[in-house]
């Protein structure tokens, strides 16, 4: 009977008593791109260009001051200044922290609007006027 078979230690030892080593190093793709970078209301538009999986590039929005607001009655877009974030269905805390995500209701110079783009992914804020 082998005593190695009954050894119940940490995961760093093999049944034979030998040390376990890493199979491979931690690769960049396994880290998942880091923590989420949610755009905030700021004094000016701040964008970062980032390399993503496959060698592609993605323009991310860090801070925003303006939004492209679509006015359905007039069938045109207007570049409007964002005054505040009214509510965010994704997370109530986002509105308090001035985070802008898809579906958030923002107050602009032309009225209230709902964000239709993904600012953190697209690098721009598109919205539709609701008032």
Swiss-Prot record:
One of its GO terms (biological process) is translation. InterPro entries: Ribosomal_eS8, Ribosomal_eS8_CS, Ribosomal_protein_eS8_arc, Ribosomal_Se8/biogenesis_NSA2. It holds the Pfam family Ribosomal_S8e. One of its GO terms (molecular function) is structural constituent of ribosome. GO terms for cellular component: ribonucleoprotein complex; ribosome. Keywords: Ribonucleoprotein, Ribosomal protein. Residues 1-38 are annotated as: Disordered. The keyword RNA-binding does not apply. The keyword Transcription regulation does not apply. Residues 16-30 have a biased composition (Basic residues). Belongs to the eukaryotic ribosomal protein eS8 family. Part of the 30S ribosomal subunit. HAMAP family: Ribosomal_eS8 (MF_00029). This is Small ribosomal subunit protein eS8. It comes from Pyrobaculum arsenaticum (strain DSM 13514 / JCM 11321 / PZ6). The lineage of its organism: Archaea, Thermoproteota, Thermoprotei, Thermoproteales, Thermoproteaceae. The gene is rps8e.
């Amino acid at each position: 009977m082998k005593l190695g078979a009954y050894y119940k230690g940490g995961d760093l030892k093999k049944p034979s008593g030998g040390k376990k080593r890493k199979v491979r190093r931690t690769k960049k793709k396994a880290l998942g791109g880091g923590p989420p970078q949610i755009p905030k209301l700021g004094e000016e538009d701040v964008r970062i260009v980032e390399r993503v999986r496959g060698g592609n590039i993605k323009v991310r929005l860090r801070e925003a001051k303006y939004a492209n607001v679509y006015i359905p009655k007039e069938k045109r877009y207007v570049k409007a200044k964002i005054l505040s974030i009214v509510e965010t269905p994704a997370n109530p805390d986002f509105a308090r922290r001035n985070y802008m995500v898809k579906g958030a209701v923002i107050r602009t110079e032309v009225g209230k609007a709902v964000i239709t783009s993904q600012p953190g992914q697209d690098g721009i804020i598109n919205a539709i006027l609701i008032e």
